[in-house]
């Protein structure tokens, strides 16, 4: 099952400040168990990041901010990234430090489609699950 969530800016700020992920575990929800693919996108006017990933079994696990934060940490997000792309007019996909423009896609479907096949060509493989 494919699920889409929003990662709040304050969690990205934690990465920018260099906080360790394991130090945040106490104050954030239980970790989710995930599949092998995921991506992130940011839209103009906010610093929120949209995170999509495939969940192995949604009945047993759920999406939470800590898991999304772990994903974003894999991308080496910097303050420059946040300032540059949050202020941009376009929607981008973030993949291991690379940014791919998604202007040719339907922006409305980015946030509502539970099975966004248009993004299947660009997976984020991280090799771990909780």
Regions found by a protein language model. Name each.
Residues 1-130:
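Structured alpha/beta reader/binder surfaces that contact nucleic acids or chromatin modification marks
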